[in-house]
Amino acid sequence: MHIAVVGLSHRTAPVEVREKLSIPEQTMEESLQNLRGHDQVLEASILSTCNRLEIYTLVRNPELGISAVREFLSSHSGLETGDLKPHLFAYHHEDAVGHLLRVAAGLDSLVLGEGQILSQVKKMMRLGQEHKSLGPILNRLLTQAVSTGKRVRSETNLGTGAVSISSAAVELAQLKLGQSRGLDELVTLEDEQVAVVGAGRMSRLLLQHLQAKGASGVVVLNRTVARAEALAADFPTLPVQCRPLKDLDHCLSTCSLIFTSTAADDPIIDAERLSKLNRRSSLRLIDIGVPRNIAADVEGIGGVDAHDVDDLKEVVERNQEARQQVAREAQGLLDGEARQFLEWWDSLEAVPTINRLRSSMESIRSEELMKALSRMGPDFSARERKVVEALSKGIINKILHTPVTALRSPQPRSDRQNALSVVERLFDLQADEDSVQN
């Protein structure tokens, strides 16, 4: 068996490719079932965010398993495998383990050290558990990835002052507004008429950072006004107007800065929609949705300045240099966590032999106990029988403790295989098909 990951990210694919592979939560169960339906895939878990799609699997054969995942991605996205392959990365075994730990720690994020990715890894694990696509291997790996992500943030300064996608979007707005005034600096948003489309987690973060950057008020549009009102209630000192999404055209006509972050499958703003509006001032659109909420053709509309998540790199690069040294320090911690998981993985090789050894000892114990009890006669009480049985089990456990601990302990694979061979010969342990790992 092998752990493998196949995916793409902001490092390997532009947003127009990433949005085609995005897997929303409502279709996650179906996608996981499709993956698990392949005879090569034993366990599966999917991480889908605005900047990456990664599929982690436990497979029988790494080459065949990775090929199966690529075929799934091609079918899901509608892209030919040949067109998709240049954007994909694939790792297996220790490289796959190391990659997941880097992702959970925020070292592979567009915004180095950002905290939201850890929540997304937790969600990946929760969905895998709910849809029963995880087994003991990936469940152990994801659990360790989450604990590693927490440890990196608590034991290093990586998370200190880290920006998020939402805060980078607000900074991009400040930067572009400053550049429009001939300034290479971030300027306040107090004079901007700001709107946020969507009322989810990303929109919550947008409101938080808009308030911090001086926005005097925000319009929140959402299909469900009640959800927008619930969001606004968390910002009592920020004037927030809540409107239904049908008022979007009004906001497009009156606002100067609009952020979009919805789960819509198709763009909600395009050139045709904008061309019908009677605007008298410029409009800046910043889209952090994947799939994109704003169509690429809006760039052809005069007075409209549109940006998507890939444009956030301009802001991120201004903040990254000072964090690189901290990231290098965090990598040492990740290396230790990866070794720990791989040592556990290697120890699984001993499990079938240990199980057969325990089974053999239990058969001997049970047989000899029955012989002894039969000689005790009817005067031997039930309580005394329980004491003798507990004694026999205790003796077996004491005898097995040292060899079992030795077989499970970290060691070169050749040493463990030699030890397993010796134990199997000494105790005449015959392997059966059910106990042999694929």
Curated annotation (Swiss-Prot):
Its gene is hemA
Purpose of the protein: Catalyzes the NADPH-dependent reduction of glutamyl-tRNA(Glu) to glutamate 1-semialdehyde (GSA).
**Active site (catalytic residues):** 50
Q: In which pathway does it act?
A: Porphyrin-containing compound metabolism; protoporphyrin-IX biosynthesis; 5-aminolevulinate from L-glutamyl-tRNA(Glu): step 1/2; Porphyrin-containing compound metabolism; chlorophyll biosynthesis
Quoted from the entry, the domain comment is: Possesses an unusual extended V-shaped dimeric structure with each monomer consisting of three distinct domains arranged along a curved 'spinal' alpha-helix. The N-terminal catalytic domain specifically recognizes the glutamate moiety of the substrate. The second domain is the NADPH-binding domain, and the third C-terminal domain is responsible for dimerization.
Q: Where is this site: Important for activity?
A: 99
Q: Name one Pfam family in it.
A: GlutR_N
Task: Describe the reaction catalysed, as an equation.
Answer: (S)-4-amino-5-oxopentanoate + tRNA(Glu) + NADP(+) = L-glutamyl-tRNA(Glu) + NADPH + H(+)
InterPro entries linked: 4pyrrol_synth_GluRdtase, 4pyrrol_synth_GluRdtase_dimer, 4pyrrol_synth_GluRdtase_N, GluRdtase_CS, GluRdtase_dimer_dom_sf, GluRdtase_N_sf, NAD(P)-bd_dom_sf, Shikm_DH/Glu-tRNA_Rdtase
Q: Quote the record's binding site residues for substrate.
A: 49-52, 109, 114-116, 120
Species of provenance: Synechococcus sp. (strain WH7803)
Among Gene3D superfamilies, the record links this protein to: Glutamyl-tRNA reductase, N-terminal domain, NAD(P)-binding Rossmann-like Domain
Keywords from UniProt, A to Z, are: Chlorophyll biosynthesis, NADP, Oxidoreductase, Porphyrin biosynthesis
Instruction: Please cite one Gene Ontology biological process associated with this protein.
Output: protoporphyrinogen IX biosynthetic process
> GO molecular function, one example?
NADP binding
Which family does the record claim for this protein?
Answer: Belongs to the glutamyl-tRNA reductase family.
Instruction: Please describe the quaternary structure of this protein.
Output: Homodimer.
UniProt binding sites for NADP(+): 198-203
Q: Lineage of the native species?
A: Bacteria, Bacillati, Cyanobacteriota, Cyanophyceae, Synechococcales
Q: Under what name is this protein listed?
A: Glutamyl-tRNA reductase
**EC no.?**
1.2.1.70
An additional note in the Swiss-Prot or TrEMBL entry is: During catalysis, the active site Cys acts as a nucleophile attacking the alpha-carbonyl group of tRNA-bound glutamate with the formation of a thioester intermediate between enzyme and glutamate, and the concomitant release of tRNA(Glu). The thioester intermediate is finally reduced by direct hydride transfer from NADPH, to form the product GSA.
